[in-house]
A protein has these predicted regions:
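Intrinsically disordered, low-complexity activation-like regions
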Residues: 1-73, 78-152
Length: 152
């Protein structure tokens, strides 16, 4: 499996329907298909994916989105969140955000929105504003971290 397989799956019509409203069946499907890829990514084995915009995006999806499905309701769902933030920041530094489409950008920036670091929150709000996205959610996430120092 390569990064293109992750991109094709995540941005398919079927998957799009479950980006923010998953089901136990979808969570299980992702776990069955991608848990071994997640393990490889978590070990650093897939760091070479960072050499391209699509590869970075796929790595972020594997590290940030898939664990939320595969390990829903457990601490393990956040285990690779920091790694996803690092990949996102590197991608932005390489100007990959200027290459990806709108849907892809949303997931490129998502690790920053999930971060409990206020600097990351400020970066994602600026990026949402730069690309003229609906920034209501991005500001809401930042305000929670600003107020509580973390997500309650």
């Amino acid at each position: 499996m390569n990064h293109s397989d992750v991109i094709k799956y995540w941005f398919s019509e079927k998957s799009r329907q479950h980006w923010f409203f998953s089901t136990p069946e979808i969570d299980n499907e992702i776990k069955q298909r991608y848990e071994q890829i997640w393990i490889r990514a978590a070990s650093g084995e897939l760091n070479g994916w960072q050499d391209s915009p699509q590869g970075c995006l796929a790595l972020i999806i594997v590290l940030d989105q898939f664990p939320l499905n595969m390990f829903r309701g457990t601490a393990k769902s956040f285990q690779t969140e920091e790694m996803a933030v690092e990949v996102a920041l590197k991608a932005i530094k390489k100007s990959y955000d200027e290459i990806l489409n709108t849907d892809e950008l949303l997931f490129l920036f998502m690790p920053l929105m999930h971060s409990e670091n206020i600097e990351h929150q400020n970066i994602q709000v600026k990026l949402f504003e730069k690309y003229d996205f609906n920034d209501e959610y991005s500001k809401h996430h930042r305000n929670i971290v600003k107020r509580f120092g973390r997500f309650p």
